[in-house]
């Protein structure tokens, strides 16, 4: 059985036991979180697609850790002006493990 959930403006295909990194959630490590925005659920040949969400279906996950991604370097170079701007960004993420898909 697998499901497609929506969180942080992105969609993820998840199964029980799947570990993935999503946009940062303001929840402590070790706590549980429930995703109610389930776009699709499939169990063998039985596929249910929501409009936009499947009713009465939730996905439970456990927060494993919080962290930052690797740094992305941004360089803006102005030709012939002897000028450049350098900047870095580290995106915050939450690592979760899918515990259960309630369908």
From Swiss-Prot:
One of its GO terms (cellular component) is cytoplasm. The keyword Protein transport does not apply. Keywords: Ribonucleoprotein, Ribosomal protein, RNA-binding, rRNA-binding. InterPro entries: bL21-like (IPR028909), bL21-like_sf (IPR036164), Ribosomal_bL21 (IPR001787), Ribosomal_bL21_CS (IPR018258). It holds the Pfam family Ribosomal_L21p. GO terms for biological process: translation. The keyword Ribonucleoprotein applies. One of its GO terms (molecular function) is rRNA binding. PROSITE patterns: RIBOSOMAL_L21 (PS01169). Part of the 50S ribosomal subunit. Contacts protein L20. Belongs to the bacterial ribosomal protein bL21 family. This protein binds to 23S rRNA in the presence of protein L20. HAMAP family: Ribosomal_bL21 (MF_01363). PANTHER family: 50S RIBOSOMAL PROTEIN L21, LARGE RIBOSOMAL SUBUNIT PROTEIN BL21M. This is Large ribosomal subunit protein bL21. It comes from Ruthia magnifica subsp. Calyptogena magnifica. The gene is rplU.
